[in-house]
Amino acid sequence: MGAIAWSLWQIVAVNDYSEINKANWDERAPAHAASPGYAIDRFLADPEFLSDVVRFDLPLLGDIRGLRGVHLQCHIGTDTISLARLGASMTGVDFSGPAVRQARALAAQTGADATFVESDVYEAADAVGSGQFDLVFTGIGALCWLPSIERWARVVASLLRPGGRLFIREGHPMLWSLGDSRPDGLLVVEYPYFERDEPMIFDEAGTYVSTDVVFKHTLTHEWNHGLGEIITALLGSGLTITGLTEHDSVPWEALPGQMTLLSSGEWRLTDRPWRLPHSYTLQAVKAS
């Protein structure tokens, strides 16, 4: 997701959503790897460098040394490799072949303890093995691509070993429900807060990092999921919620022209940021 305007909302059939989204991400993966926004040069130059997302997560993530982790919807692997640099043995899963190839190249160049597997997130347990992981990690901008949060929660539970932990930091569903930035600065709910059967369709020419690439695949199909729906899905899959923290910042300029860039790399509403939960961290464990 990125600092771009959502220009179109239509109701359509779900059937082809995965292929449409995959074409979009396949095209963007090499552009993202070449963009300063993903800081590939810093990963190569500094063996202790971590992504802004993972640095933000550190206080709640804690010590993960020696854990076996899987990062769902890992894209080009910068967060996955950051987790490996913290001492975990990581597996990244993504449905985009070009993204996985970029991630594998970065892992090889940096010597990170990270492997990458091409798979749809809903098929992740078949791709990497059930009950194998101490940690399931999911980062910003992942859940909006999934039509069923209940199915996702079942996948998470199947991946975790007994006693294993889910760690997710995501854009807040209240933020996802807001319309485009307005000159008057009002925050207006325009898109669904709750999961719907029908996707939202967005037609966006650009992407969320700086690039001169002109993209051909501009359509995406997306879904929002209410915070209660996410928690209920995890509880229904047999996990126990151990933590929920809402944050007043997010790692991208979600509302262009209405946010201030912080020294941490996070963005926050310039005017009365306490009006809106920007993101959240949710943690859960599987019974021992």
Protein language model annotation of sequence segments:
Residues 165-208:
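Conserved class I S-adenosyl-L-methionine
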Residues 150-165:
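A short glycine-rich, Lys/Arg-flanked "PGG" loop and its adjoining helix->strand segment in the class I
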Residues 220-244:
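Short alpha-helix
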